[in-house]
Every structure is written in structure tokens, then in C-alpha cells.
């Protein structure tokens, strides 16, 4: 039996921005559901954070969620299971009130706010929602008692990659899940593997942190117990490097920007010797109708040829802030202050300016 795994879909991201809804629809209309139909897959497990806002939902976003996902699931006779994530609940200490129960309790959808073991074919799988104070004891006991060797959940595990270049230092220990042959989880938006823990990542780019990070969904085969990654080719964030030194006009002005419509674009100017060419270059880029264009001048002449060079030349924002907190003179717990800073930073990433 093959099961489609998808997680962290975050409907309503960036203040319910319409261009993100359009971008998400392309993925579901052209990639996700056609793949399931072509491969005769009729079961989906969503590993949490189906919506973005914790306390309410925009009606336009709700209609989009129904039209692009839930109605198609119903029309195609797909068996949908949703694990409750931290963005699906308004309170930090309980999953009792959650988006799936309040919005879709009349739909034929199975959702899990407490740890459960469900048989998919002949394979028992432990489904683990977001763990908080109210369900912690039940979650731990269920993991001990379950006969399942596979666990799917929405977990915060220390020692795993939170985003590229940043390891999560908080949450449960990797060893807490050692009894399972395979653990697949949502919550962190970048794909990673730590021992038997597989973070699946979100299906599309939501912030600049996702730039050039592989996005998509997975297929789990209950017979082989293997995960297959299906990549989403659509991108929301793009970078263009401008350098007219020693170039002909045609080299600069014949670039193809047709794929940039509805996306965010950063133009990194390394050498700008001909202002007229640059103006023409920018005019052509604007005609492609991107959502936002940001120009970044490489005024330090760092000769940064690609994005890996840029990353290697600078510390990330969280590291800089953590070092600042570490060097502060304060009576407040620096660990608690650092945790608060990281939480606020992650929240800010998803706010539309």
C-alpha cells in the first residue's frame, strides 16, 4: 500500500496573501493530485499545520482550502487522515480545540488530537499530534504500548535541523523514538534525516529561508517501508545576479524572466558599469510581473558567485541575536530570553509586510 504524506501546508500564510494562495493552487492542481491519480494512491496522511493562523481563519483562505484540497479529496474518494499540529490549535497547552474539529467535523476526515495507532492495510502506524502539557503523559504511554514500528507525527525534537544551518536545541530527545524503525515528522520546514527521524519539510516555499531548499511531498510504501520524495518544481523566491562587466548588451537583456510572475525576486548587482543597460534589465524584469523586487548591491566587491558563497560569508540572523543575548548583562534567564527571541523570529518570518 502506498500513502501520500504531506505536511505544513499553512493555508493563510503571510497574512492570507492572495499570491501565495495562487502559488499553492498550482502545486495542488498540477503536481499533487495528478500524481496521486496517475499512481492510483487513495490515502493521504497530513502531518500537521494544515492552516497557518492559530486563532482564526480568513473566509477567502477557507474557501481556497476547500476548493483546492478538501473538496478534491472528497470528490476523488481519498481517505484523508490529519495529525493536529501546533498551528492547528489556539492554545499552547491543549489540542482539544483545533481547526479540523471546528471547521470540518462534518467532513469525512479523520483527525488526531491525541496519540493513536491506526492500521493502514496490514501495517499499524502510530500517529502523534503536537505534544503539550495536557497530552504528554498519554503520548509517552502510547509510544511505549503501541505495536507500531512506524510513527508519523508533528514533533519538536532536539538535535534535528530546524532550518538550513540551524540545529534545534529544544524539545524531545532523538532517543525517545528509538523503538521505531522510521519516524516521519512535520513542524520543521526543511528536509532532513537524523538517525531514524525524517523531517519531511513543507511542500512549497513560504519564506526566503526556503530559497533553493527542496520542497514537495512524500510517498510511503507500507511493504518496503521506504519514503519516496516527489519534488515541487514551482518556486516563490528567485535571485538574479547582475554583472555587465565585459558583457554584450544581448548577454544582459535576453535573460528569460517568464517564470518570475507572482514571485519574489532579489537582484544582486555585482558590477553595474552601464546604467542604461541596468534600467532596461529592470524594465524587462518588472514586465514579468513579480510580486516584489529587491535590489541588493554587492558594494563590498565580495565577488559572491552563488548563494553558498553568500551563506559562508555571513552568520544567520538567529546566530547574531543569540550571541548578542549571550553577551548581555542581565538578571533575566538568558536561555528563556533566547527561546523567546527564536519564537518571535520564526513568527516574523511568516508575516507579510
Range-by-range predicted roles:
Residues 222-353:
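Accessory, non-catalytic peripheral segments of nucleic-acid enzymes
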Residues 163-228:
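Conserved beta-sheet core of the metallophosphoesterase superfamily
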Residues 2, 9, 13-117, 176-178:
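Core catalytic region of metal-dependent phosphoesterases/phosphodiesterases
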Residues 10-14, 52-55, 82-94, 118, ...:
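Active-site environment of divalent metal-dependent phosphoester hydrolases
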Residues 65, 88-175:
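Conserved catalytic scaffold of divalent metal-dependent phosphoesterases
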Residues 8, 28, 44, 49, ...:
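Divalent metal-coordination and catalytic microenvironments
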Residues 73-76, 142-145, 174-179, 259-260:
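Short, conserved loop/helix-junction motifs that constitute active-site signature segments
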